[in-house]
Regions:
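Sec-dependent bacterial lipoprotein signal peptides
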Residues: 1-18
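Loop/turn elements at helix/coil->beta-strand transitions in domains of secreted/extracellular proteins
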Residues: 41-43, 124
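Short, low-complexity N-terminal intrinsically disordered segments enriched in polar/charged residues
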Residues: 16-40
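Residue-level detector of secondary-structure boundary/capping sites
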Residues: 7, 22-25, 110
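Short solvent-exposed beta->alpha transition segments
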Residues: 28-29, 33, 44-94
Length: 129
């Protein structure tokens, strides 16, 4: 939860320092931060980055955390892990408070994979959808 507040603070600072904040860029940075949590093994923060994370039962939240850990273990077996995440592009619809962020995973076996991360903005914070 503290990390979500940190992200909200970053968004607020960006909003105060510039009139025309690019919400697509904010969504992209938030998506990258959530995936950085995943790479760092902070699975709870990754799960908490999903929209409406606070309205799910604790048992389901624990299952999501376990799934994130299993996913990272699978990537280690198949690709020698995810070594880095890069933002490639973002397409934002500010009227609908939504964005699609395109990220590239750089794997330990020198392969790359581009993924699309749907994001949604709620009360000034961008969440994974």
């Amino acid at each position: 939860m503290r990390k979500l507040l940190y992200i909200a603070l970053l968004i607020a600072v960006a909003a105060c320092t510039s009139k025309g904040v690019d919400q697509g860029e904010v969504a992209a940075r938030a998506a990258k931060q959530y995936y950085d949590y995943l790479l760092q093994g902070d699975y709870a923060s990754f799960v908490d980055g999903h929209f409406r994370h606070d309205s799910i039962p604790d048992t389901y939240r624990e299952q999501l955390i376990a799934n994130a850990k299993m996913y990272m273990n699978q990537q280690t077996v198949e690709h020698r892990g995810i070594k880095d995440v890069h933002i490639v592009q973002v397409k934002a619809d500010t009227e609908k408070h939504a964005a699609n962020v395109f990220l590239v995973f750089a794997y330990g076996d020198s392969t790359n994979e581009e993924i699309v991360v749907p994001m949604v903005e709620n009360k000034g914070v961008w969440y994974l959808r």
